[in-house]
Amino acid sequence: MREILHIQGGQCGNQIGSKFWEVVCDEHGIDPTGRYVGTSDLQLERVNVYYNEASCGRFVPRAVLMDLEPGTMDSVRTGPYGQIFRPDNFVFGQSGAGNNWAKGHYTEGAELIDSVLDVVRKEAENCDCLQGFQVCHSLGGGTGSGMGTLLISKIREEYPDRMMLTFSVFPSPKVSDTVVEPYNATLSVHQLVENADECMVLDNEALYDICFRTLKLTTPSFGDLNHLISATMSGVTCCLRFPGQLNSDLRKLAVNLIPFPRLHFFMVGFAPLTSRGSQMYRSLTVPELTQQMWDSKNMMCAADPRHGRYLTASAMFRGKMSTKEVDEQMINVQNKNSSYFVEWIPNNVKSSVCDIAPRGLSMASTFIGNSTSIQEMFRRVSEQFTAMFRRKAFLHWYTGEGMDEMEFTEAESNMNDLVAEYQQYQDATADEEEELYEDEDDADLQE
């Protein structure tokens, strides 16, 4: 049944990924040794989306873990769920990519990629009907961005008709880990535009803000941020893993969210977000969830949806609720805020309802939006890129690994084209669209 193969790369990807497996194991009632300790048959019904059942009745995640240095892998292995993974699926080098995209994509990463692909192939052959791949990585470093995009393009070659979903952590506007982030991110986006089907865009600053403002955590750790991400990741695929009244899968999601093939970078949000202390005092309603999930403060990337318009959006609800109420709320949102939706795509919000809520909540919702305001992120990275590239700063680290300046120029213009496309559809009105069609019709007639 519709399996998803999970791949995590680099330090960031491995940390998010291991948090994600903690959440999914908890939802399916699987303990750190891979044994089922749950109470409900529903947990086992479609457990095989993310797990392989071994002969001894243990469940092994369909996960591939890769990195160019052993450090993060060791901490995953010694972490709470470290023993659940298949030992052969840890693939790591020794040298590290040193935040250098070229090392991850062309030199160090290229040497390791074949052994990663062998593991991916093995896992894919174990699947009954593979639905697609989900990749966790960051775009600012060297391994997740360079080697991550290399792996995505190789998988694309070998499995062209399978969905490719990525959870990509973009460099944040104010929090920077490395100076060369804009280079690494731009080179990665250049690849993701061509080779990924759906990219969920995350960034640390927006996640910090959520922890700080909404969850009232005074000193949020990466663990807290990753917990937010993993709640969203689990929400995106809950329809595949649990029975629901309105199902959605990765492909349905893509068909409903991507009006133009290049514009597949989504904002994600999750509700309810309440600070840990006040959680028990709230009873949730569908209108409350809806209000929170459409709130710009809830978005996990630093772009404000009020500065653009939604091309499409998807709302995934979990818990016991009436679908009628969900539909009413969605229509309500569109009617009240019609200026924030493009008018040339009618009914552009897809909703799905899954019956099983996450642990500790009566209902929850995951939001995925394709908004033109995401161009703010690309624009910001692009400006930083141009500032450095104009001076050819730090370029020798990349050319030294065999890269050509031409590649940088191409990546830069691809990113700028993407921004221009988002802007074009933000400004488009229904009348203009009609004019375009009429022009095309005239052209047909003249032929």
Curated annotation (Swiss-Prot):
Keywords: Cytoplasm, Cytoskeleton, GTP-binding, Magnesium, Metal-binding, Microtubule, Nucleotide-binding
Any GO MF annotation of the entry: GTP binding
GO biological process, one term: mitotic cell cycle
Superkingdom of source: Eukaryota
InterPro entries attached to this UniProt entry: Beta-tubulin_BS, Beta_tubulin, Tub_FtsZ_C, Tubulin, Tubulin/FtsZ-like_C, Tubulin/FtsZ_2-layer-sand-dom, Tubulin/FtsZ_GTPase_sf, Tubulin_C
Binding residues annotated for Mg(2+), in chain numbering: E69
Gene Ontology CC annotation, any one: microtubule
SMART domains: Tubulin (SM00864), Tubulin_C (SM00865)
Cofactor field: Mg(2+)
Subcellular location: Cytoplasm, Cytoskeleton
Record note on quaternary structure: Dimer of alpha and beta chains. A typical microtubule is a hollow water-filled tube with an outer diameter of 25 nm and an inner diameter of 15 nM. Alpha-beta heterodimers associate head-to-tail to form protofilaments running lengthwise along the microtubule wall with the beta-tubulin subunit facing the microtubule plus end conferring a structural polarity. Microtubules usually have 13 protofilaments but different protofilament numbers can be found in some organisms and specialized cells.
Family: Belongs to the tubulin family.
Stated name of the protein: Tubulin beta-5 chain
Native organism: Triticum aestivum
